């Protein structure tokens, strides 16, 4: 087994590297669980893609994805509790953004979508 160089690199041809370097395998498992292994994962993936392209409030997300507002709120709560999205405030019109951790690991998210057959 090869040992990394201490700079976040590893011996698996870069498969564990995100935008910002090393990808924590626990975070990757969390993404797999939330996107590929649970009911509602497709909608969570769609929300993450939308918020990555342009942060928005829950109402705007519901309109753009053509989903019920309460469904969006549920998925945003799941994503928020798991550290994937964050809001600028707790207001009704709060804008949702990807967390720095999710931004750093966005490539892993895309990889999961490709393997899951959704990209």
Regions found by a protein language model. Give the residues of each.
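Short amphipathic alpha-helical interaction segments
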Residues: 67-78
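Short, Lys/Arg-rich nucleic-acid/phosphate-binding segment
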Residues: 89-95
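Conserved segment of winged-helix/HTH DNA-binding domains
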Residues: 30-31, 95-119
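Hydrophobic residues on short alpha-helical segments
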Residues: 45-51
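A short acidic, leucine-rich amphipathic alpha-helix
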Residues: 60-64
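Glycine-centered, phosphate/nucleic-acid-interacting loop/turn motifs that mediate DNA/RNA or nucleotide
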Residues: 83
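Short alpha-helical segments that sit at the start of domains
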Residues: 17-45
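Short capping segments at the starts of secondary-structure elements
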Residues: 42, 53-57
């Amino acid at each position: 087994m090869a040992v990394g160089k201490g700079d976040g690199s590893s011996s698996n041809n870069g498969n564990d590297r995100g935008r910002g370097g090393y990808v924590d395998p626990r975070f990757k498992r969390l993404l797999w669980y939330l996107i590929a292994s649970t009911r509602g994962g497709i909608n969570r993936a769609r929300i993450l893609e939308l918020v990555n392209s342009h942060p928005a409030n829950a109402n705007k997300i519901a309109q753009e994805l053509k989903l019920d507002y309460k469904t969006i709120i549920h998925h945003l709560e799941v994503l928020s509790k798991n550290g994937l999205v964050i809001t600028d405030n707790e207001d009704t019109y709060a804008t949702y953004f990807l967390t720095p951790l999710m931004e750093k690991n966005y490539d892993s998210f895309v990889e999961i979508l490709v393997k899951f057959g959704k990209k």
